[in-house]
Regions:
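ASCE P-loop NTPase helicase motor core
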Residues: 57, 83, 152-265, 322-330, ...
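Conserved helicase NTPase catalytic core signature
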Residues: 102-167, 337-476
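Pre-P-loop entry segment of helicase/translocase ATPase cores
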Residues: 35-37, 42-44, 51, 56-178, ...
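Charged C-terminal transducer/switch regions of large nucleotide-driven machines
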Residues: 1-55, 237, 244-249, 253-406
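A short beta-strand element within the Helicase C-terminal
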Residues: 475-481, 665-676, 691, 699-702
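Conserved helicase/translocase motor-coupling segment
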Residues: 580-649
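Helicase C-terminal subdomain and adjacent C-terminal extension
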Residues: 519-558, 679-781
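Nucleic-acid endo/exonuclease domains
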Residues: 733-887
Length: 887
């Protein structure tokens, strides 16, 4: 019968084309087949006979590809493919009303695969061949959610205990929960934050739930790391390393009929006890994690306070009298509020009453102390603030550390790991331990018997571009974990999405993306334009990870915050610069010397092409002879292959390579050789610098040219500023660095003093200005800058012989201040002073003279000063223009 007009399903199979006639009589079907004249009878419920189909000439709108057309017979869809074959399926699994723009995205990726895919010996794209296996998008696959983001995401209710046999921290626990409960979840894993541990625990939980999981990456190194950890726990009997043909062949040849010895069985009562215990331990563990992270943050804050105090004592011309400090042992906030009150109270009877109140009632200072010059009084208060803040931080650290030791004595985390491993092993014993012999699979079984294969080997390893070829075209994994997803290109990632019901995407948007061959750019751009691709699917603009984050902004995402790898001084630059200070640094600072050093080669053109002999000499003659670190634990990173080759010849056994080759690796000492004389987008790329820095565990040395070092508003310049500030060595300058911890606390105390928590000044104009300056500095162009209000001029400008006597007196007055100082975050160096000039106030003779003095002082010390008027518009633009000019 004509299969374009009729559909006959007999005993669940489409038999339309093999039937000559069909007739219903008395609740019985009479069917005559085309190859015989005999008529057979079938019970009514064994046959489905449908007519008058709805024809779809654009099957891509149903998420169907490689097809001429599709016919809808009520709840069935029959697809007629280009190659002459047909397929019948229920319409419930199809995507209804696919928008043409969404269909275009898939077709765009499919055509891109012919351009960007690796070619075989016949010049055929392997990616393209895999794309040709995708006939349709089904609701169950993650690919349908990515291409149709408005489609509801499936959620999973998990009643089983959350296992953590590989160890755990707070962020990792959230990552596991997200992975198990959500169809799509994202793990942002900065370097050294335990991405592999998170992946292992997700694998463990998927096994415990009886599921299978595929672990893929753009290279084998990342997945090999996961495999080796599973090997350590004796779990590789569950793994199949597939992907390319050689891997499949090797795996099939090495199969064994036998299972390993399983752990001794445990009773159901014990299993129930462990399950309940794990649920309770997971709750108790959160208290440990919270306290552990609080201690780490407190250590970071204490370190910053001590470093700033060190700069304060070096920079200030201190006349501190220790016996007065004993009278100022008060809460740090109270000290600053008192200082501000003294600054804002004019000399006279009101000042006298304030002093009486301070030392008679509040017991702060004494009459002798308050007879000192106001400048000295303020200096004592600021010194006491640091001492008190540091003492308080140490007290909190001591208290929290003792509390953590008490909690750790309960061995909560050890029991959690032990019970998790026991339950996992028991579930695997039940799943496999009763089998007498393990089946042996053939290559054909991978295509026709994938479900049984993945029951036996529920952990599959592959590269991202090869995972589609591992099994039959319609097979879906329960879970797919894509590691190093920032390095996976969009086309390959989309292909991987087609093989999974649930996906966990692991990567770091702050690290290197995939590299796009520049010779392909024009072809790619032409396709993007022709298919009218939305920006978040644009191959040139996005890696797979960044595209998913853009397409699915509401997908559960967690940043792994706890960092274990790098010395705190190394990682804290990346933390401040790239991660918004969200990382919790759990590595230890034991006061090691020379953790960070910058070597600046003299001015001059030392680079020739893409190599720099001066840098090679610095490494060979200055850095390496003075290190005690073993050669195998030293790595040299350079942007260019030519410099890499020359370095390798010069330093022999020490490994030199490009930053792309170092991603995912680590060394005790990393030497970054920037090579070029001039800063450019390539060597100053934020992601390259982030990767390069975070390879170093114990020490990092940076080599730059004089020109690169002094190029403003660059990532490398920010890093050099950071290194300089961390060295805590005095810097000869007419402008002092800003004590930002002191003056941030000062601004908060000032707000309390003014009884307006959001106000930093009694003048509305200054409050408005502060708000719009903060808004401007939030923009990417100014991410390395911050602003502080009401900074005393003497804290910024060095009082030297270039100033007149009148200017010195004005500058030394404690009440003389800048309305705002915009400064570099990394070394606290002032960039710009900002004054807010009200018309009436600033046009008095007295104020005009003060403004003249301030302008002259700033000019002599090369500190740019911008005056913003309360009577003029476009002040925001003036500030932006000034910042742009300075940077």
């Amino acid at each position: 019968m004509d299969s374009t007009k009729f559909l006959i399903i007999l005993n669940g199979e489409d038999k339309t084309e093999s039937i000559a006639s069909i007739k219903k009589q008395d609740d019985v079907w009479h069917i005559t087949f085309a190859n015989t004249a005999k008529t057979y009878t079938y019970k009514y419920d064994k046959v489905i006979f449908l007519t008058n189909p709805q024809r779809h000439t654009k099957p891509e709108k149903l998420g169907i590809y490689n097809a001429k057309f599709a016919l809808i017979f009520e709840k069935y869809c029959k697809i007629f493919f280009d190659n002459g074959t047909t397929k019948l399926l229920e319409t419930a699994i199809l995507l209804p009303n696919v928008k043409s723009s969404n269909a275009n995205v898939f077709l765009y990726c499919k055509e891109l695969a012919t351009i960007v895919g690796v070619k075989n010996e016949d010049n055929e794209s392997l990616l393209s061949r895999a794309y040709n296996k995708i006939d349709m998008l089904v609701k169950e696959s993650v690919l349908s959610n990515y291409l149709h983001p408005s489609q509801p995401h499936r959620t999973n209710e998990i009643n089983a205990p959350i296992l953590s046999p590989f160890g755990l921290n707070a962020s990792q626990f959230q990552a596991i929960c997200n992975a198990l409960e959500s169809q799509i979840s994202i793990i942002e894993g900065p370097p050294g934050t335990g991405k592999t541990q998170s992946i292992l625990n997700i694998i463990a939980n998927s096994l415990f739930l009886g599921k299978n999981v595929a672990v893929v990456s753009n290279n084998n190194a990342a997945t090999d790391n996961v495999f080796m950890k599973l090997e350590k726990y004796g779990l590789t009997y569950l793994c199949a390393k597939l992907g390319k043909k050689d891997n499949i062949k090797q795996f099939l040849q090495n199969q064994s009929h036998t299972y390993p010895d399983f752990a001794q069985s445990i009773t159901q009562e014990r299993k129930d006890t462990f399950s309940q215990a794990i649920k309770k331990l997971n709750i108790q563990a959160q208290e440990i994690f919270t306290l552990q992270n609080a201690i780490a943050k407190q250590k970071t804050m204490l370190s910053a306070l001590e470093l700033e105090f060190h700069h304060f004592t070096m920079q200030e011309n201190l006349t501190i009298r220790p016996h007065f400090l004993t009278l100022l042992q008060k809460d740090s906030t109270l000290l600053l509020k008192t200082k501000i009150a003294l600054e804002n109270t004019p000399k006279g009877w009101r000042y006298f009453l304030l002093v009486c109140k301070l030392f008679l009632i509040q017991r702060i200072g004494n009459f002798t102390f308050y007879k000192l010059p106001l400048q000295d009084i303020i200096q004592h208060f600021e010194y006491a603030y640091y001492m008190q803040s540091i003492a308080t931080a140490r007290e909190i650290l001591t208290h929290d550390t003792k509390r953590l030791e008490i909690l750790r004595d309960t061995q909560t985390l050890e029991h959690l790991q032990e019970y998790s491993l026991t339950l996992l092993q028991e579930s695997l014993r039940i799943r496999y331990g009763t089998h007498t012999q393990r089946p042996i699979f053939s290559e054909k079984d991978l295509l026709t018997n994938a479900e049984q294969f993945c029951d036996e080997y529920p952990i599959i390893f592959s590269t991202t571009h090869a995972i589609k070829n591992c099994f039959g075209r319609d097979f879906l994994f329960d879970y797919l974990i894509i590691d190093e997803a920032s390095q996976v290109d969009l086309v390959t990632g989309v292909l991987a999405l087609s093989v999974a019901r649930n996906i966990v995407i692991v990567g770091d948007t702050k690290q290197l993306p995939n590299v796009i061959d520049s010779t392909m750019s024009q072809q790619i751009q032409e396709l993007t334009t022709r298919y009218k691709i939305p920006p978040h699917y644009d191959y040139m603009q996005h890696s797979f990870l960044s595209s998913v984050c853009s397409v699915l902004p509401n997908a559960p995402s967690v940043l792994l915050k706890e960092h274990y790898r790098c010395h705190p001084k190394i990682i804290n630059f990346c933390n401040q610069k790239f991660y918004g200070s969200e990382l919790v640094i759990l590595s230890e600072d034991n006061g090691e010397a020379n953790v960070l050093e910058a070597y600046v080669s003299p001015a001059g053109n030392h680079a020739r092409g893409h190599y720099n002999q001066r840098e090679i000499d610095i490494i060979a003659n200055e850095i390496l002879p003075n290190t005690t670190i073993e050669p195998q634990e030293i790595g040299i990173i350079t942007p260019y292959n030519e410099q890499k080759a020359r370095l390798q010849n010069a330093v022999g056994e020490i490994e030199a390579d490009t930053v792309h080759k170092y991603q995912g690796r680590e060394k005790d000492l990393i030497i970054i050789a920037t090579t070029d004389n001039q800063s450019n987008d390539f060597i100053d790329d934020s992601k390259m610098l982030n990767v390069a820095i975070t390879r170093a565990k114990k020490q990092l040395k940076l080599i730059v040219s004089y020109e690169v070092c002094h190029k403003q508003n660059t990532n490398i310049n920010d890093f050099i500023r950071y290194i300089t500030y961390q060295s805590a060595k005095p810097i000869e300058s007419k402008i002092y660095s800003i004590f930002d911890l002191l003056y941030k606390a000062n601004a908060q105390a000032r707000a309390l003093y003014l009884k307006g928590k959001r106000r930093i000044s009694q003048f509305d104009s200054e409050n408005i200005a502060f708000a719009f300056i903060k808004d401007i500095l939030q923009q990417d162009s100014y991410h390395s800058l911050d602003v502080l209000p009401h900074i005393p001029l003497a804290k910024v400008i060095k009082i030297d012989e270039t100033l007149t006597q009148e200017e010195k007196l004005y500058a030394q007055n404690p009440l003389t201040h800048f309305d705002f100082i915009i400064y570099h975050i990394m070394d606290k160096a002032p960039l710009l002073a900002v004054e807010i000039d009200g018309y009436a106030f600033h046009h008095t003779h007295k104020q005009l003279n003060r403004d003249r003095l301030k302008d002259s002082i700033c000019k002599k010390h090369n500190l740019p000063l911008l005056r913003l008027s309360t009577t003029q518009s476009a002040e925001s633009k003036r500030l932006k223009d000034m910042l742009q000019a300075l940077l």
